């Protein structure tokens, strides 16, 4: 049995800097910068640096993603389970920002044609962004991690409730968790649940208790921080450590990704363990 299947986006974000966001008409573009990311892509780049074994499941259009695939393959990331559509583009997100507000235009492209299938048996299967994965989740025996991210509205009330109940763990950010509770009517989670809340840190709901993990002050771009946090969680699970230890790993890794950027992330296992001990002494009584 393999360790982890990770479902999500290999997204190209095109960042467009403008002086102001117009209601209509046109404005001058000050800067145009593509960035390789997505829920699965960001996770994969960080997880690979810690040699966490995983299989990436996603779909891309080869009109746009050849360079992206070449980059992650050069890092040793296996793309054998990434479905490649030769005559398709995407997924691409165009993000225009004036520094205060932003507007996004999402082209799903290949993801809309993808019919995902699991190719092997895994201990963990992580379902993040993409199509509605509920039918697949109901048919497998793996430990399911439900992580709908910004696509939580893709699921109905009953689907959200069912996916959560059959999962080993659910992961939301603070906004998604509010949406989840409002849609399902659940006042508290039924299974182990992680809620991330940016600079306020994260919370673990487990066995009827809540454990809070403060964030480490950071300054930088937060894009990819949440996906990097998940790499820390799986690093702990792969090494048969506790979920609480994974929360600390994730907090520290996300801090470094925010400060340094994913492309410059260089934290090694020795330094991570040292920083984990420092974090435990400062913030927690249990890990």
From Swiss-Prot:
Keyword ATP-binding attached: yes
Catalytic activity: adenosine + ATP = AMP + ADP + H(+); cytidine + ATP = CMP + ADP + H(+); guanosine + ATP = GMP + ADP + H(+); inosine + ATP = IMP + ADP + H(+)
Superkingdom, taxonomy of origin: Archaea
Cofactors, names only: Mg(2+); Co(2+)
InterPro entries: Myo_inos_IolC-like_sf, NucKin, PfkB_dom, Ribokinase-like
Enzyme class name: transferase
Keywords: ATP-binding, Cobalt, GTP-binding, Kinase, Magnesium, Nucleotide-binding, Transferase
Statement: the UniProt record of this protein carries the keyword Lipoprotein: no
GO biological process: adenosine metabolic process; cytidine metabolic process; guanosine metabolic process; inosine metabolic process; nucleoside phosphate biosynthetic process; phosphorylation
GO molecular function, one term: ATP binding
Cofactor details (free text): Can use Mg(2+) and Co(2+) with equal efficiency in vitro, and to a lesser extent, Mn(2+), but not Ni(2+).
The enzyme's E.C. designation: 2.7.1.20, 2.7.1.213, 2.7.1.73
Residues involved in substrate binding: 13, 28, 38, 42, 104, 150, 227
Site (Transition state stabilizer): residue numbering on this chain: 230
pH dependence: Optimum pH is 6.6. Significant activity is observed over the pH range of 6.4 to 7.8. Enzymatic activity decreases markedly at pH 8.0 and at pH 6.2 and below.
List of residues binding ATP: 102, 173, 196-201
A Pfam family it matches: PfkB
SUPFAM superfamilies, A to Z: Ribokinase-like
Catalytic residues of the enzyme: 227
Assembly and interaction partners: Homodimer.
Family: Belongs to the carbohydrate kinase PfkB family.
Function: Nucleoside kinase with broad substrate specificity. Catalyzes the phosphorylation of a variety of nucleosides to the corresponding nucleoside 5'-mono-phosphate in the presence of phosphate donors and divalent cations. Displays the most efficient activity with guanosine, followed by inosine, cytidine, and adenosine. Negligible enzymatic activity is detected with thymidine, uridine, and 2-deoxyadenosine. ATP is the most efficient phosphate donor, but can also use GTP and ITP.
Protein name in UniProt: Nucleoside kinase
Origin organism lineage: Archaea, Methanobacteriati, Thermoplasmatota, Thermoplasmata, Thermoplasmatales
